[in-house]
Design a protein with these regions (language model features):
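Conserved PLP-binding catalytic core of the aspartate aminotransferase-like
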Residues: 291-324
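Conserved active-site segment immediately N-terminal to the catalytic lysine
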Residues: 180-192
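PLP-dependent enzyme catalytic core of the Aspartate aminotransferase-like
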Residues: 335, 339-394
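Active-site C-terminal subdomain of aminotransferase-like
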Residues: 16-17, 192-286, 390-394
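Active-site phosphate-binding strand-loop segment of PLP-dependent enzymes
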Residues: 117-171, 186
Length: 394
């Protein structure tokens, strides 16, 4: 028997995409050295710079964003380099595997997975560990629904001459970035989260200092590898060539979502995510449920993480939402499995009042179905009341 597809994909990514994106992705395949594709790739790179709000080089690597995270480590870290790795969640901890794989020495600064890293603790760690060359941090920890104060963290790092590697996979589109002002040397994002695109590409912003560090890597620059960011610099940025065949249809999709994002306007696009996230938190609280993040100021814009209350079978809850009502949400991930579940609201299709209302309505009904009574309509009502000045056409 074939499993029926969900009516609503409200999981933590890949997310639902807009009809225009699917249409644009389905355009005829071009030869990657056709002048039309070269023009399209250049235009898409320029759009990506606008979304990052940077004059730094934009790099579009051909692989899901985990490729870009490993590429950052592989291209920058020399054996013996000290890397201050900030850990506030599953993905922050995971990055240590890359640091050590490429010979780096990890210095870990960790906080509980419902909290965020304090920039002053970063300052103290850098004082206590002279010679740190790089700092790595996750901006938006999707598994725990939290975010770190990346702007202040990066500024502290630059005070010490430390280059920064930022995981913005689920952050881009949920917050306004300014890599030059903030001190983001390598920022790695994905199109399948807040931008509402399809998975398959890595989106990067790379500073001049990061390029120089890649060239200075010991025993030599990483070249001739799928992980080489420098290969993209010399091939595409300097020569309008590709180090390997790009994923043509994925580039079509990326161009489409970047155009749609900029048509809305970056400030408005981010404001929508922030507003929907606040409404989701209000809805969850109205159902008598606790949020996983320790405080609202560190709650992510992309997902709302909900603590599993005592006595609730969260796997049964998710199964009920998915198979009885057709709504897919995400469980906890890694060490957080069974401790929380996540309501996603990222990208234009998810971060919308209509979608949020449906998600909360199904959550309410499913909680009742699995024996955890709540007042039907309470969550939806609180969320809609919290939306304030939402206007699709404004």
């Amino acid at each position: 028997m074939t499993t029926q597809w969900p009516r609503l994909n409200l999981a933590a990514g890949p997310v639902e995409v807009m009809p225009r994106t699917l249409r644009d992705q389905g355009r005829p395949i071009l030869y990657h050295y056709d002048p039309a594709f070269i023009e399209l790739f250049a235009r898409t790179s320029g759009l990506l710079q606008q979304v990052f709000r940077t004059e730094y080089d934009a790099v579009i690597m051909q692989g899901e964003a985990i490729l870009g995270l490993e590429a950052a480590a592989a291209s920058l870290i020399s054996p013996g380099d000290k890397v201050l790795n900030l850990v506030s969640g599953v993905f922050g901890k995971w990055f240590e595997d890359f640091i050590e794989k490429y010979g780096g020495e990890t210095i870990e600064l960790a906080v509980p997975y419902d909290d965020a890293v304090d920039p002053e603790d970063v300052r103290r760690a850098l004082h206590a560990n002279p010679g740190v060359k790089f700092l790595s941090v996750v901006h938006s920890e999707t598994p725990s629904g939290t975010h770190n104060p990346v702007r202040d963290i990066c500024r502290v790092a630059h005070e010490f001459g430390v280059l920064t590697m930022i995981d913005t996979v689920s952050g881009l589109g949920g917050e306004l970035y300014s890599p030059e002002e903030w001190g983001m040397d390598v920022a790695v994002a994905g199109p399948q989260k807040c931008l509402g695109g399809t998975p398959g590409l890595t989106l990067m912003s790379v500073s001049p200092a990061a390029w120089a560090a890649m060239e200075a890597r010991r025993p030599g620059p990483l070249r001739g590898s799928f992980l080489s960011i420098l290969d993209w610099k010399s091939a595409w940025l300097e020569g309008r060539r590709f180090p390997y065949t790009p994923s043509v249809s994925e580039v079509y999709s990326l161009e489409s979502v970047l155009e749609q994002t900029l048509a809305i306007g970056m400030e408005r696009f981010v404001d929508r995510h922030q507003l929907i996230a606040a409404a989701a938190r209000a809805g969850v609280r109205a159902l008598g449920l606790d949020l996983w993040p320790a405080r609202d100021e560190i709650a992510a814009a992309c997902v709302t993480a909900v603590t599993v209350p005592d006595g609730l079978d969260e796997a049964l809850l998710r199964k009920t939402m998915r198979h009885r009502y057709g709504v897919m949400i995400s469980p906890g991930y890694g060490s957080l499995q069974g401790k929380l579940f996540r309501l996603a609201h990222m990208g234009p299709a998810q971060a919308h009042p209509t979608t949020l209302a449906a998600q909360l309505a199904v959550l309410e009904r499913s909680l009742v179905d699995v024996g955890h009574p709540v007042a039907l309509g309470a969550g939806v009502g609180a969320a809609m009341a919290a939306l304030g000045n939402w206007n699709d056409e404004a």
